[in-house]
Curated annotation (Swiss-Prot):
UniProt gene name: Ikzf1
The keyword DNA-binding is annotated on this UniProt entry: yes
Organism the protein comes from: Mus musculus
Official protein name in the record: DNA-binding protein Ikaros
Consequence of changing residue 195 to A: Abolishes phosphorylation, no effect on DNA binding nor on pericentromeric location. Loss of DNA binding and pericentromeric location
Effect on the protein upon substituting residue 156 to A: Disrupts pericentromeric heterochromatin location. Partial cytoplasmic location
Length: 517
């Protein structure tokens, strides 16, 4: 078939075709081709290959294909999409397009009834002769070659992308961190790591992921093994089709649950932030100091990101059932709950052994959130302008309510959650609070688990107990809390607070201002 096609080409050019032999001579020159058919190097290569036998053409294309694969192994960054290519190669117009398309269809393309061309080597369908010409280079030649490593490509865009490997150029940069990459799609995938939501959800167990690749790995690693073993899933398959009204209700419930967990997690984040180096800001030289808005915005964004992640993990782990009764609690009954819990604790005999096993983690979480709510109510009551003076009756009752709530919480913690040093610390705290609740006259008598009385150092200003004299000394002003002149004066920046609540808030925030003389 190739011989007949070569004869047809010779008739078009007006010259006779030389005799075809099995082994062509090395000194033979390529067959002359008219100018309208020799527009590109691909057409010249195809016209030259018509002089040989069909078997020789197949051998040459196979060797060129192997060389192309070797070039891809040497440094091509991404695979080329050879299914449907855009008409971005060399363009022909008028009669050149018709003649070129007929020549290409005769060389290596099969014209389909819909007008498209099909490659006779791999069967890929191209929309036009120019696209087929570019595609044929993947089987024969790669004209765009890297002058540094020798890697060859069929398109110029792939070569330019490959050159960035040698130059180290990364034009696409993330505006949230220091990540930079060479491709736009890689940056798009990286930006998903900064998002809070997890759109890709597993329909087998309900876990969510930010990237689809992570979800696919999760399915291959876990669920394929469970299905092969014939084990049922952790929960039934979740239907993807949901009603918009149900989704809106779920979002409202999640918002209420997040507000309850926020009080508990805010203290942990504040402690983590206060442990970092303090930021000193001057009043006079504030404008002269260098300010990088990107760093501060990044820090705030990462802090909120950590908070959102912690809240989502807590809600996913604990579930919504343990938090839903607290959402429905009316505001008027919040002040009665701590009193009821304290009365229940005073009449309950202390148990020497561990708590019973029927107390679950949800009970502990309910009590924990209940206690945090009681603390917030008592703190608001003491911080109000009408009660700015220190009333001994109110403060003692509030402290008693907090101690009773802590004792109630300690007795209801799941025994499986206690181990090692944490168990000893909880037992010590339990002994301290039990001694404080049983005898109000001797409220600061601390007894260890062995029955020995421990010495306690109390801060009269903050109402905090210390079992270590060193920590008490640090707290009182040697290294930074209370000042020597005023107990509510910051020893680091000299800020004066009106009460202990403002002083504690100032220390927790960790932003100190110093006055330059």
């Amino acid at each position: 078939m190739d011989v007949d096609e070569g004869q047809d080409m010779s008739q078009v050019s007006g010259k006779e075709s030389p005799p075809v032999s099995d082994t062509p001579d090395e000194g033979d020159e390529p067959m002359p081709v008219p100018e309208d058919l020799s527009t590109t190097s691909g057409a010249q290569q195809n016209s030259k290959s018509d002089r040989g036998m069909g078997s020789n053409v197949k051998v040459e294309t196979q060797s060129d294909e192997e060389n192309g694969r070797a070039c891809e192994m040497n440094g091509e960054e991404c695979a080329e999409d050879l299914r449907m290519l855009d008409a971005s190669g060399e363009k022909m117009n008028g009669s050149h397009r018709d003649q070129g398309s007929s020549a290409l269809s005769g060389v290596g393309g099969i014209r389909l009834p819909n007008g498209k061309l099909k490659c006779d080597i791999c069967g890929i369908v191209c929309i036009g002769p120019n696209v087929l010409m570019v595609h044929k280079r993947s089987h024969t030649e790669r004209p765009f070659q890297c002058n540094q490593c020798g890697a060859s490509f069929t398109q110029k865009g792939n070569l330019l992308r490959h050159i960035k490997l040698h130059s180290g150029e990364k034009p696409f940069k993330c505006h949230l961190c220091n990540y930079a990459c060479r491709r736009r799609d890689a940056l798009t995938g990286h930006l998903r790591t900064h998002s809070v939501g997890k759109p890709h959800k597993c329909g087998y167990c309900g876990r969510s992921y930010k990237q689809r690749s992570s979800l696919e790995e999760h399915k291959e690693r876990c669920h394929n093994y469970l299905e092969s073993m014939g084990l049922p899933g952790v929960c039934p398959v979740i239907k993807e089709e949901t009603n918009h009204n149900e989704m809106a209700e779920d979002l409202c419930k999640i918002g209420a649950e997040r507000s309850l967990v926020l009080d508990r997690l805010a203290s942990n984040v504040a402690k983590r932030k206060s442990s970092m180096p303090q930021k000193f800001l001057g009043d006079k030289c504030l404008s002269d100091m260098p300010y990088d808005s990107a760093n501060y915005e990044k820090e705030d964004m990462m802090t909120s990101h950590v908070m959102d992640q912690a809240i989502n993990n807590a809600i996913n782990y604990l579930g919504a059932e343990s938090l839903r009764p607290l959402v429905q609690t009316p505001p008027g009954s919040s002040e009665v709950v701590p009193v009821i819990s304290s009365m229940y604790q005073l009449h309950k005999p202390p148990s020497d052994g561990p708590p019973r096993s029927n107390h679950s983690a949800q009970d502990a979480v309910d009590n924990l959130l209940l206690l945090s709510k009681a603390k917030s109510v008592s703190s608001e009551r003491e911080a109000s302008p009408s009660n700015s003076c220190q009333d001994s009756t109110d403060t003692e009752s509030n402290a008693e309510e907090q101690r009773s709530g802590l004792i109630y919480l300690t007795n209801h913690i799941n025994p499986h959650a206690r181990n090692g040093l944490a168990l000893k610390e909880e037992q010590r705290a339990y002994e301290v609070l039990r001694a404080a609740s049983e005898n109000s006259q001797d409220a600061f008598r601390v007894v260890s688990t062995s029955g020995e009385q421990l010495k306690v150092y109390k801060c009269e200003h903050c109402r905090v107990l210390f079992l270590d004299h060193v920590m008490y000394t640090i707290h009182m002003g040697c290294h930074g809390c209370h000042g020597f002149r005023d107990p509510f004066e910051c020893n680091m920046c000299g800020y004066h607070s009106q009460d202990r609540y403002e002083f504690s808030s100032h220390i927790t925030r960790g932003e100190h201002r110093y006055h330059l003389s």
